[in-house]
Amino acid sequence: MGRIIVVDGTSNAGKTTLCENIEKNIQDIGIVPGASIFAKINRSRYPKIPAIPQSAEEEKENQKFFFRLELDRLNEANRFANQGKTVFMDRGVLEILSVAYSFESINGWDGIYKNAQDLYEQFISYARNMGINLPDKYIWLQANYEEIQRRNKLRQQERGQLLSETDWIEENLIGKQIEFFRKMCIPENTDKICLIDTNNMTKQEVLEEVCSLLKLQLKVYDRGEK
């Protein structure tokens, strides 16, 4: 049985980039793409992805959708792990709690974080009862607001996105995300959570740090192959 590792953290901290580099540079790896890409791949089950909520009630409905989606993603991770692969998930179920924690404070939507916590407990209970393995490890990537702004502009230019696409990089949201993940980094979780500050790290350095933490070997390429 392979390990299941979730890559999570603040917006634009390098989660998807890390997963792409892992897939390219490490053997016997399974990658579970982020929720929106996973939903597009499985369009028959998820024909429409909810928009950013405009009210507490919309957020609670969104939570139900994304918890169902996360269960499918976790099942996909288990499928890879049962093949003996080391599995990396581009974000995981705690992302839902992170969003609820942030939106409750920023928008004043009382009760949405508690609602997410209740759904999370149901999610964990269901997974255990069904024999679905939960993640073995969490890699949390963190970057400050200034660095996130810089990376977002660069990524938008590299990937052809509009420069106005900034819904997930507002300073107060990033601050709340950092606060949430720090709250999770309690002593009881130290064997499960690895927090990496990516502010002054290159993509390659982040990849090498993850390989060191997880005792994974990078592929050895022949000259000119990479």
What are these regions (language model features)?
Residues Q149-K226:
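NTP-dependent small-molecule kinase module
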Residues A13:
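ATP-binding Walker
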Residues T16:
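Walker A/P-loop
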Residues E23-N75:
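Conserved substrate/cofactor phosphate-moiety recognition/catalytic segment
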Residues T10:
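P-loop (Walker A) phosphate-binding loop of NTP-binding proteins
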Residues L74-N82, T86-R159:
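ATP-dependent NMP and nucleoside kinases share a basic, alpha-helical "lid"
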